[in-house]
Amino acid sequence: MSSYDNHQALAGLTLGKSTDYRDTYDASLLQGVPRSLNRDPLGLHADNLPFHGADIWTLYELSWLNGKGLPQVAVGHVELPDTSVNLVESKSFKLYLNSFNQTRFASWQDVAETLTRDLSACAQGEVKVALYRLDELEGQPIAHLHGACIDDQDIEIDNYQFSTDYLQGAASGKIVEETLVSHLLKSNCLITHQPDWGSVQIQYRGAKIDREQLLRYLVSFRHHNEFHEQCVERIFNDILRFCQPESLSVYARYTRRGGLDINPWRSNGDFSPATGRLARQ
Protein backbone atom coordinates (compact mmCIF):
# COMPACT_ATOMS: atom_id res chain seq x y z
CA MET A 1 0.00 0.00 0.00
CA SER A 2 1.32 3.42 -0.91
CA SER A 3 1.47 6.04 1.83
CA TYR A 4 -0.27 8.61 -0.36
CA ASP A 5 -3.21 6.64 -1.82
CA ASN A 6 -5.67 8.85 0.10
CA HIS A 7 -3.90 12.11 -0.76
CA GLN A 8 -6.21 15.05 -1.45
CA ALA A 9 -4.68 15.43 -4.92
CA LEU A 10 -6.38 12.15 -5.85
CA ALA A 11 -9.80 12.99 -4.42
CA GLY A 12 -11.12 14.75 -7.52
CA LEU A 13 -10.12 12.09 -10.04
CA THR A 14 -12.81 10.40 -12.13
CA LEU A 15 -10.83 7.16 -11.81
CA GLY A 16 -12.87 4.57 -9.92
CA LYS A 17 -16.09 6.57 -10.24
CA SER A 18 -19.09 6.35 -12.56
CA THR A 19 -18.73 8.87 -15.37
CA ASP A 20 -20.62 10.13 -18.40
CA TYR A 21 -19.02 9.56 -21.79
CA ARG A 22 -18.97 12.73 -23.87
CA ASP A 23 -18.38 12.61 -27.61
CA THR A 24 -17.83 16.31 -28.28
CA TYR A 25 -14.51 17.96 -27.56
CA ASP A 26 -13.87 18.89 -23.94
CA ALA A 27 -10.32 19.61 -22.76
CA SER A 28 -11.49 19.91 -19.15
CA LEU A 29 -11.83 16.12 -18.99
CA LEU A 30 -8.05 15.76 -18.68
CA GLN A 31 -6.77 15.34 -15.12
CA GLY A 32 -3.20 15.50 -13.90
CA VAL A 33 -1.59 13.86 -10.87
CA PRO A 34 1.42 15.60 -9.29
CA ARG A 35 4.62 13.62 -9.83
CA SER A 36 5.70 14.84 -6.39
CA LEU A 37 3.16 12.46 -4.83
CA ASN A 38 5.46 9.46 -5.12
CA ARG A 39 8.72 11.36 -5.50
CA ASP A 40 8.58 13.10 -2.13
CA PRO A 41 8.53 9.82 -0.13
CA LEU A 42 11.47 8.61 -2.24
CA GLY A 43 13.45 11.77 -1.54
CA LEU A 44 13.31 12.83 -5.20
CA HIS A 45 12.99 16.52 -5.99
CA ALA A 46 12.23 18.20 -9.30
CA ASP A 47 15.34 20.38 -9.18
CA ASN A 48 17.71 17.45 -8.60
CA LEU A 49 16.31 14.29 -10.20
CA PRO A 50 18.77 11.37 -10.51
CA PHE A 51 17.35 10.48 -13.93
CA HIS A 52 15.92 11.76 -17.19
CA GLY A 53 13.25 10.08 -19.24
CA ALA A 54 9.69 10.17 -20.51
CA ASP A 55 6.31 8.49 -20.40
CA ILE A 56 5.51 7.12 -23.86
CA TRP A 57 1.82 6.61 -24.58
CA THR A 58 0.29 4.80 -27.55
CA LEU A 59 -3.26 5.85 -28.45
CA TYR A 60 -5.03 3.02 -30.28
CA GLU A 61 -8.60 4.35 -30.12
CA LEU A 62 -8.35 7.82 -31.61
CA SER A 63 -11.09 9.05 -33.95
CA TRP A 64 -12.65 12.35 -35.00
CA LEU A 65 -14.63 13.85 -37.90
CA ASN A 66 -13.05 15.75 -40.75
CA GLY A 67 -14.47 19.03 -42.05
CA LYS A 68 -17.11 17.17 -44.09
CA GLY A 69 -18.14 14.90 -41.22
CA LEU A 70 -16.28 11.79 -42.41
CA PRO A 71 -14.78 9.83 -39.49
CA GLN A 72 -11.00 9.65 -39.32
CA VAL A 73 -8.90 7.14 -37.36
CA ALA A 74 -5.28 7.25 -36.30
CA VAL A 75 -2.78 5.75 -33.90
CA GLY A 76 -1.20 8.37 -31.68
CA HIS A 77 2.26 8.51 -30.11
CA VAL A 78 2.62 10.81 -27.11
CA GLU A 79 5.68 11.57 -25.01
CA LEU A 80 5.48 13.32 -21.63
CA PRO A 81 8.85 14.41 -20.24
CA ASP A 82 9.76 13.21 -16.76
CA THR A 83 10.24 16.88 -15.86
CA SER A 84 6.54 17.73 -16.27
CA VAL A 85 4.83 18.74 -13.04
CA ASN A 86 2.05 16.18 -13.51
CA LEU A 87 1.56 12.80 -15.05
CA VAL A 88 -1.72 12.39 -16.96
CA GLU A 89 -4.27 10.11 -15.32
CA SER A 90 -5.19 7.42 -17.83
CA LYS A 91 -8.99 7.23 -17.40
CA SER A 92 -9.26 10.98 -17.85
CA PHE A 93 -7.07 10.65 -20.96
CA LYS A 94 -9.47 8.04 -22.36
CA LEU A 95 -12.52 10.21 -21.63
CA TYR A 96 -10.79 13.19 -23.24
CA LEU A 97 -10.00 11.20 -26.39
CA ASN A 98 -13.62 10.00 -26.55
CA SER A 99 -14.67 13.64 -26.71
CA PHE A 100 -13.03 13.87 -30.13
CA ASN A 101 -15.35 11.22 -31.61
CA GLN A 102 -18.13 13.51 -32.87
CA THR A 103 -16.06 16.67 -33.17
CA ARG A 104 -15.06 18.14 -36.54
CA PHE A 105 -11.44 19.14 -37.09
CA ALA A 106 -10.20 20.93 -40.18
CA SER A 107 -7.09 18.75 -40.56
CA TRP A 108 -4.91 16.08 -38.98
CA GLN A 109 -2.50 18.83 -38.02
CA ASP A 110 -5.32 20.56 -36.15
CA VAL A 111 -5.91 17.38 -34.14
CA ALA A 112 -2.20 16.98 -33.35
CA GLU A 113 -1.91 20.62 -32.29
CA THR A 114 -5.00 20.32 -30.08
CA LEU A 115 -3.62 17.22 -28.37
CA THR A 116 -0.23 18.86 -27.88
CA ARG A 117 -1.73 22.01 -26.39
CA ASP A 118 -4.15 20.27 -24.03
CA LEU A 119 -1.77 17.57 -22.82
CA SER A 120 1.01 20.10 -22.25
CA ALA A 121 -1.37 22.23 -20.19
CA CYS A 122 -2.49 19.24 -18.11
CA ALA A 123 1.01 17.88 -17.56
CA GLN A 124 2.54 21.34 -17.16
CA GLY A 125 5.38 20.31 -19.42
CA GLU A 126 6.27 20.17 -23.10
CA VAL A 127 4.45 17.18 -24.58
CA LYS A 128 5.24 15.73 -28.02
CA VAL A 129 2.50 14.24 -30.22
CA ALA A 130 2.66 12.31 -33.51
CA LEU A 131 -0.28 10.81 -35.43
CA TYR A 132 0.05 7.82 -37.76
CA ARG A 133 -2.25 6.59 -40.49
CA LEU A 134 -3.01 2.89 -40.30
CA ASP A 135 -1.22 2.10 -43.55
CA GLU A 136 1.94 3.52 -42.02
CA LEU A 137 1.83 0.84 -39.32
CA GLU A 138 0.60 -2.18 -41.28
CA GLY A 139 3.12 -4.99 -41.34
CA GLN A 140 4.97 -3.60 -38.34
CA PRO A 141 6.55 -6.62 -36.60
CA ILE A 142 6.08 -7.50 -32.95
CA ALA A 143 9.08 -6.13 -31.10
CA HIS A 144 10.97 -7.55 -28.14
CA LEU A 145 13.00 -6.03 -25.34
CA HIS A 146 16.69 -6.70 -25.89
CA GLY A 147 18.46 -8.40 -23.01
CA ALA A 148 18.76 -11.59 -20.98
CA CYS A 149 15.40 -12.75 -19.63
CA ILE A 150 15.59 -13.62 -15.93
CA ASP A 151 12.15 -15.26 -15.62
CA ASP A 152 12.96 -18.96 -16.07
CA GLN A 153 14.60 -19.48 -12.69
CA ASP A 154 13.83 -22.56 -10.62
CA ILE A 155 12.98 -20.73 -7.42
CA GLU A 156 10.15 -20.92 -4.90
CA ILE A 157 8.22 -17.77 -4.00
CA ASP A 158 5.50 -17.52 -1.35
CA ASN A 159 5.59 -13.82 -0.44
CA TYR A 160 4.18 -11.22 -2.81
CA GLN A 161 4.30 -8.12 -0.60
CA PHE A 162 6.50 -5.33 -1.88
CA SER A 163 9.91 -5.17 -0.23
CA THR A 164 13.27 -3.61 -1.03
CA ASP A 165 14.92 -6.20 1.23
CA TYR A 166 15.45 -8.44 -1.79
CA LEU A 167 17.96 -5.92 -3.14
CA GLN A 168 20.06 -5.87 0.03
CA GLY A 169 23.53 -7.07 -0.96
CA ALA A 170 22.29 -7.95 -4.46
CA ALA A 171 25.26 -6.36 -6.25
CA SER A 172 28.80 -7.61 -5.72
CA GLY A 173 31.89 -8.82 -7.54
CA LYS A 174 33.25 -7.70 -10.86
CA ILE A 175 31.96 -4.76 -12.87
CA VAL A 176 29.69 -5.81 -15.73
CA GLU A 177 27.61 -4.10 -18.37
CA GLU A 178 24.41 -5.99 -19.11
CA THR A 179 20.72 -5.72 -19.91
CA LEU A 180 18.16 -7.81 -18.03
CA VAL A 181 14.50 -8.33 -18.92
CA SER A 182 11.48 -9.65 -17.04
CA HIS A 183 7.92 -10.13 -18.26
CA LEU A 184 6.64 -10.90 -14.75
CA LEU A 185 6.04 -7.34 -13.61
CA LYS A 186 2.55 -6.91 -12.20
CA SER A 187 1.41 -4.00 -10.10
CA ASN A 188 -2.03 -2.56 -9.40
CA CYS A 189 -3.73 0.74 -10.09
CA LEU A 190 -3.29 3.15 -7.20
CA ILE A 191 -7.03 3.93 -7.04
CA THR A 192 -8.98 0.94 -8.40
CA HIS A 193 -6.41 -1.75 -7.56
CA GLN A 194 -7.02 -3.33 -10.97
CA PRO A 195 -3.99 -5.28 -12.23
CA ASP A 196 -1.42 -3.66 -14.51
CA TRP A 197 0.73 -6.08 -16.53
CA GLY A 198 4.12 -5.15 -17.90
CA SER A 199 7.55 -6.12 -19.14
CA VAL A 200 10.61 -4.36 -17.75
CA GLN A 201 14.09 -3.85 -19.16
CA ILE A 202 16.96 -2.97 -16.81
CA GLN A 203 20.24 -1.87 -18.38
CA TYR A 204 23.16 -1.10 -16.11
CA ARG A 205 26.91 -0.91 -15.68
CA GLY A 206 28.24 -1.77 -12.26
CA ALA A 207 28.78 -4.60 -9.81
CA LYS A 208 26.91 -7.67 -11.07
CA ILE A 209 23.34 -7.84 -9.78
CA ASP A 210 22.15 -11.21 -8.50
CA ARG A 211 19.35 -12.26 -10.85
CA GLU A 212 17.39 -14.25 -8.29
CA GLN A 213 17.29 -11.32 -5.87
CA LEU A 214 16.29 -8.95 -8.66
CA LEU A 215 13.48 -11.24 -9.80
CA ARG A 216 12.17 -11.64 -6.25
CA TYR A 217 12.16 -7.86 -5.93
CA LEU A 218 10.21 -7.40 -9.17
CA VAL A 219 7.70 -10.10 -8.22
CA SER A 220 7.12 -8.31 -4.91
CA PHE A 221 5.27 -5.60 -6.85
CA ARG A 222 2.44 -8.09 -7.36
CA HIS A 223 0.27 -6.56 -4.62
CA HIS A 224 1.73 -3.06 -4.85
CA ASN A 225 -0.60 -0.18 -5.71
CA GLU A 226 0.93 2.61 -7.80
CA PHE A 227 0.60 4.11 -11.25
CA HIS A 228 2.87 2.77 -14.01
CA GLU A 229 5.12 5.83 -14.01
CA GLN A 230 5.53 5.69 -10.24
CA CYS A 231 6.51 2.01 -10.29
CA VAL A 232 9.26 2.64 -12.83
CA GLU A 233 10.68 5.49 -10.77
CA ARG A 234 10.56 3.32 -7.65
CA ILE A 235 12.40 0.49 -9.41
CA PHE A 236 15.04 2.91 -10.70
CA ASN A 237 15.48 4.53 -7.29
CA ASP A 238 15.68 1.23 -5.41
CA ILE A 239 18.25 -0.34 -7.75
CA LEU A 240 20.30 2.85 -7.72
CA ARG A 241 20.20 2.97 -3.93
CA PHE A 242 20.93 -0.66 -3.12
CA CYS A 243 23.06 -1.76 -6.09
CA GLN A 244 24.81 1.57 -6.81
CA PRO A 245 25.50 1.00 -10.52
CA GLU A 246 27.61 3.51 -12.41
CA SER A 247 24.84 3.87 -14.97
CA LEU A 248 21.24 2.65 -14.96
CA SER A 249 18.22 2.65 -17.26
CA VAL A 250 14.79 1.21 -16.44
CA TYR A 251 12.12 0.87 -19.13
CA ALA A 252 8.69 -0.75 -18.74
CA ARG A 253 6.11 -1.47 -21.40
CA TYR A 254 2.64 -2.11 -19.99
CA THR A 255 -0.30 -3.79 -21.68
CA ARG A 256 -3.03 -1.49 -22.92
CA ARG A 257 -6.20 -0.58 -21.08
CA GLY A 258 -9.00 1.50 -22.56
CA GLY A 259 -7.15 1.75 -25.85
CA LEU A 260 -4.02 3.21 -24.23
CA ASP A 261 -0.69 1.75 -23.26
CA ILE A 262 1.89 3.52 -21.08
CA ASN A 263 5.61 2.89 -21.43
CA PRO A 264 7.74 4.89 -18.96
CA TRP A 265 11.53 4.97 -18.98
CA ARG A 266 14.08 6.55 -16.67
CA SER A 267 17.87 6.68 -17.14
CA ASN A 268 20.97 8.42 -15.84
CA GLY A 269 22.96 7.49 -18.93
CA ASP A 270 22.72 7.29 -22.69
CA PHE A 271 19.51 5.35 -23.37
CA SER A 272 17.18 5.25 -26.35
CA PRO A 273 14.04 3.14 -25.76
CA ALA A 274 12.73 0.85 -28.48
CA THR A 275 9.13 1.88 -29.14
CA GLY A 276 7.74 -1.14 -31.01
CA ARG A 277 4.82 -2.90 -29.35
CA LEU A 278 5.49 -6.18 -27.57
CA ALA A 279 3.60 -9.46 -27.96
CA ARG A 280 1.13 -8.60 -25.18
CA GLN A 281 0.51 -5.08 -26.44
Swiss-Prot record:
Cellular location(s): Cytoplasm
Active site: 189 (thioimide intermediate), 196 (proton donor)
One GO MF term: preQ1 synthase activity
Major subcellular location class: cytoplasm
Keywords, in A-Z order: Cytoplasm, NADP, Oxidoreductase, Queuosine biosynthesis
GO biological process, one term: tRNA modification
Top enzyme class: oxidoreductase
Function: Catalyzes the NADPH-dependent reduction of 7-cyano-7-deazaguanine (preQ0) to 7-aminomethyl-7-deazaguanine (preQ1).
Record-given protein name: NADPH-dependent 7-cyano-7-deazaguanine reductase
Organism annotation: Klebsiella pneumoniae (strain 342)
Gene: queF
